[in-house]
Amino acid sequence: MAEEKNEELQTEETEQTKEDGHGDSAEQEETENNSGTEVEEQEEPEVHPLEIELNELKDRLARVRADYENFRRRTKEEKEAQAKYRAQGFIEKLLPALDNFERALLVEPKHEEAKQLLQGMEMVYRQVEEALKQEGVEPIPTEGELFDPHLHQAVMQVSEEGYEPNQIVEELQKGYKLKDRVIRHSMVKVNQ
């Protein structure tokens, strides 16, 4: 009987060990499962509100920098354009006087004194033209050219032999450009 009790005790111990071992493996599995969840949770890090704010501030800073660079570029371009065309207002005011000079030079003098006066006016006119040329002002070419609405203003249309359609027949008032900008369009007669 003592042997039977020993066997029963051993059987119970073995069963308990199996249960304990089984229990251990369940705990191990649970621990493994929990650690797997923790790994998954670690893969998706929690974004801290301060990090979000930092990223937003970095984005705003980048936009402000870009805006500032655009502002600097625009300001520089405007200053360059101002310097390039600084004389435009003065030249626009000078053009009517230049037109009157040209008309005066077309008059045929009858007296010797008038001829000398005309020669002096021609010298002054050439000096004014040269000064304008040095500032980048040049007359717009017209006669024989094809009509260009960006450069010319058609005042009359005529039908003349020897001219192509849209070819300028006569210049009625001289036009001028300051560098690449038209100050005043040429007034012209255009062939139909």
UniProtKB/Swiss-Prot annotation:
CDD domains: GrpE (cd00446). Pfam families: GrpE. One of its GO terms (biological process) is protein folding. HAMAP family: GrpE (MF_01151). This is Protein GrpE. Residues 15-25, 45-59 have a biased composition (Basic and acidic residues). GO terms for molecular function: adenyl-nucleotide exchange factor activity; protein homodimerization activity; protein-folding chaperone binding; unfolded protein binding. It is found in: Cytoplasm. Disulfide bonds: none annotated. Homodimer. Residues 1-14, 26-44 have a biased composition (Acidic residues). The gene is grpE. NCBIfam families: PRK14140.1 (NF010738). GO terms for cellular component: cytoplasm. Belongs to the GrpE family. InterPro entries: GrpE (IPR000740), GrpE_coiled_coil (IPR013805), GrpE_head (IPR009012). Keywords: Chaperone, Cytoplasm, Stress response. Participates actively in the response to hyperosmotic and heat shock by preventing the aggregation of stress-denatured proteins, in association with DnaK and GrpE. It is the nucleotide exchange factor for DnaK and may function as a thermosensor. Unfolded proteins bind initially to DnaJ; upon interaction with the DnaJ-bound protein, DnaK hydrolyzes its bound ATP, resulting in the formation of a stable complex. GrpE releases ADP from DnaK; ATP binding to DnaK triggers the release of the substrate protein, thus completing the reaction cycle. The lineage of its organism: Bacteria, Bacillati, Bacillota, Bacilli, Bacillales. Residues 1-59 are annotated as: Disordered. Its main location: cytoplasm.
